[in-house]
């Protein structure tokens, strides 16, 4: 067997293992969803943010992509944060007098959602009639079969790939085959720092793959935007993807600010005129040919309804076919115009399989948030590219895996992690951070980044109060702060610690002074790894009139909800307090890295030191803080 065959065999074996682990996760999630749907009461579904009930049904219409959509709005429980987002499948149901749920025999897709209103794509007119005629209507998330189907398809294609670029990339990423580089000079970027400049150059020189490793606050997005901008001097168009819609929005907005024409496939999570202006749907309906296309589509629908009434069917069919041909012509013309104007096509990894991108190939694919994406999801987009640039931080949040066996088997090990280990020459570590006071940053740097990070001079000593200690640990071990288990999804709660957290925040606000806080818009975040604690903290803040003037400056969320964000002041409630030193979820140190690196100027950690310091990470963190 020659060397090339050995590379291929090893790569295929690894991908087949991925396929097996992904199948385990798929079966587990599908079964869990089935059990939830059958056994879980509607109240619990609402609390988890996966269900709205009761619903008001608003207007229905055909959108610019000729999809029948309907607007629905939740009437109650508006304070509960939901998990609906663009592209997710949903199902509708009614509740009868004895509180049994009856599901409609169709699934729909979220087209757009904000806090309380959702636009849903329906499969047809009969589905619309069903929900318009229903009493006591609700909607809930449905199992996302499509994402899994696309991941399995992508893995299958990569495993079978032979004598093409996809096969080469597979063997480079998973084998010992060396990467190649272009031989041209080093380009200076005086507006970037040295490690950012080096990262952009590494991206430009890479023929196969490059990695931009961006620890917290190091300007990963700035670097990535610069790398994309430079790539566009050599390539007409690139594909930019991320795992989440929010990350796609963020990078798209920064590219638009830089003057790059972006076409965003899918709908943004935050809706404003700037964001909407570069979405595919908005651009499609703004095209000069769209009014004519809309008229033709309406004429086709009218002719179909005449056809059902038994008019001259042959004549109508000919008219419909002729109009359909004309509509297809116009759609192709509009699409060609939109794609020829765009320099960047931006979408989620799953959306890169959208039919409107079918057959398209790109010289370069950029994947942001790559350390949060399952490897199989990355391959969905990689199939379209000749070279791949991954950006992210594998020392922060990993992909979400629900099946413990799949996680133990390594499903949470991302493509980015594998390339960092196998191909260290492709990695650029960004080393200067622009977010935190140096004392907040230093522990994370030592533990996660081999002490290689440094603070920019402008943030090194930043603080709100003179002679303030930037990071403190409030030890709750002798304060009757006891944890309680409240169920699988919500984890644990520590009510006494939450009350203490509120008191610590009040004390710090009073130290700063309310007027100064409002004048300077000093903002606060409260983080807990547990949903139950987050919800309890939100309730306490909502009920307490002390916080009324500052509510717009406060955010309370889980660690996952804070990824990519920062605040002037952060309080972390660690919750766990028990004699056995059991810390469960807190064993995932990547999550804690996210939590402790959100604060710019003040970090207050609340936790039971006797429980937590049984773990070496928390012991070291506790000692570090006490030595300051």
What are these regions (language model features)?
Residues 1-86, 118, 147:
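A helicase ATPase "motif cassette" and its flanking acidic/Ser/Thr-rich regulatory loops
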Residues 2-19, 77-201, 257, 274-302:
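Pre-ATPase regulatory/linker segments immediately N-terminal to the P-loop/RecA-like helicase/translocase core
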Residues 92-94, 348, 573:
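Residue-level recognition of conserved beta-strand edge/terminus positions
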Residues 280-321, 382-384, 596:
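ATP-hydrolysis module of ASCE/P-loop NTPase motor domains
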Residues 80, 109, 335, 557-558:
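Short, conserved secondary-structure segments in the cores of folded domains
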Residues 96, 102, 124, 173-285, ...:
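ASCE P-loop NTPase helicase motor core
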Residues 55, 105-108, 554:
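Small-residue-enriched segments and motifs
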Residues 234-236, 244, 336, 350-628:
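Conserved helicase motor core of SF1/SF2 NTP-dependent helicases
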């Amino acid at each position: 067997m020659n060397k090339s065959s050995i590379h291929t065999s090893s790569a295929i074996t690894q991908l087949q293992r991925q396929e097996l682990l992904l199948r385990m996760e798929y079966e587990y999630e599908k079964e869990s969803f089935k059990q939830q749907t059958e056994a879980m009461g509607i109240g619990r579904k609402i609390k988890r943010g996966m269900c709205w009930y009761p619903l008001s049904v608003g207007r229905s219409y055909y959108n610019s992509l000729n999809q029948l959509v309907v607007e629905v709005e939740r009437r109650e429980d508006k304070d509960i944060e939901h998990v609906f987002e663009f592209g997710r499948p949903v199902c509708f149901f009614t509740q009868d007098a004895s509180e049994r749920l009856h599901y409609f025999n169709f699934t729909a897709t979220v087209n757009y959602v904000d806090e309380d209103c959702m636009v849903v794509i329906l499969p047809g007119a009969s589905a619309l009639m069903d929900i318009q005629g229903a009493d006591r209507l609700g909607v809930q998330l449905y199992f996302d079969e499509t994402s899994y189907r696309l991941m399995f398809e992508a893995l299958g294609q990569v495993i079978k790939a032979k004598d093409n670029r996809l096969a080469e990339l597979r063997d480079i990423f998973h084998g010992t085959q060396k990467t190649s580089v272009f031989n041209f000079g080093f380009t200076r970027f005086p507006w970037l720092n040295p490690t950012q400049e080096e990262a952009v150059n590494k991206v430009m020189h890479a023929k196969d793959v490059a990695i931009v490793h961006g620890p917290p606050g190091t300007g990963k997005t700035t670097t990535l935007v610069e790398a994309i901008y430079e790539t566009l001097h050599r390539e007409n168009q690139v594909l930019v993807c991320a795992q989440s819609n929010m990350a796609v929005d963020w990078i798209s907005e920064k590219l638009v600010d830089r003057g790059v024409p972006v076409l965003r496939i899918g709908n943004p999570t935050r809706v404003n005129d700037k964001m909407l202006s570069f979405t595919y749907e908005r651009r499609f309906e703004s095209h000069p040919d769209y009014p004519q296309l809309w008229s033709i589509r309406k004429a086709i629908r009218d002719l179909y309804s005449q056809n059902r009434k038994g008019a001259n069917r042959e004549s109508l069919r000919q008219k419909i076919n002729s109009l359909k041909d004309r509509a297809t012509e116009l759609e192709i013309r509009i699409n060609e115009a939109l794609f020829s104007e765009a320099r960047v096509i931006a979408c989620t990894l799953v959306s890169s399989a959208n039919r409107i991108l079918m057959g398209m190939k790109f010289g370069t694919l950029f994947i942001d948030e790559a350390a949060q994406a399952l490897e199989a999801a990355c391959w969905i987009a990689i199939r379209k590219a000749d070279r791949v640039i991954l950006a992210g931080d594998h020392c922060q949040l990993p992909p979400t895996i629900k099946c413990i066996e799949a996680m133990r088997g390594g499903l949470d090990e991302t493509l980015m992690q594998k390339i960092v280990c196998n191909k260290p020459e492709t990695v650029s570590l960004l080393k200067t951070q622009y977010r935190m006071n140096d004392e907040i940053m230093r522990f994370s740097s030592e533990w996660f980044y081999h002490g290689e990070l440094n603070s920019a001079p402008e943030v090194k000593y930043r603080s709100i109060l003179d002679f303030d200690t930037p990071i403190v640990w409030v030890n709750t071990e002798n304060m009757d702060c006891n944890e309680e288990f409240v169920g699988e999804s919500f984890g644990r709660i520590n009510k006494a610690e939450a009350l203490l957290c509120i008191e610590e925040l009040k004390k710090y606000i009073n130290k700063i002074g309310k007027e100064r806080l409002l004048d300077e818009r000093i903002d606060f975040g409260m983080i807990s790894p547990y949903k139950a604690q987050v919800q309890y903290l939100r309730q306490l803040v909502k009920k307490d009139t002390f916080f009324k003037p500052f509510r717009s400056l406060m955010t309370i969320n889980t660690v996952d909800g804070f990824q990519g964000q920062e605040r002037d002041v952060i309080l972390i409630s660690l919750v766990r307090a028990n004699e056995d030193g059991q810390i469960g979820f807190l064993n995932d140190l990547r999550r804690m890295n996210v939590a402790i690196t959100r604060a710019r100027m003040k970090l207050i950690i609340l936790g039971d030191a006797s429980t937590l310091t049984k773990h070496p990470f928390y012991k070291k963190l506790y000692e570090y803080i006490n030595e300051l």
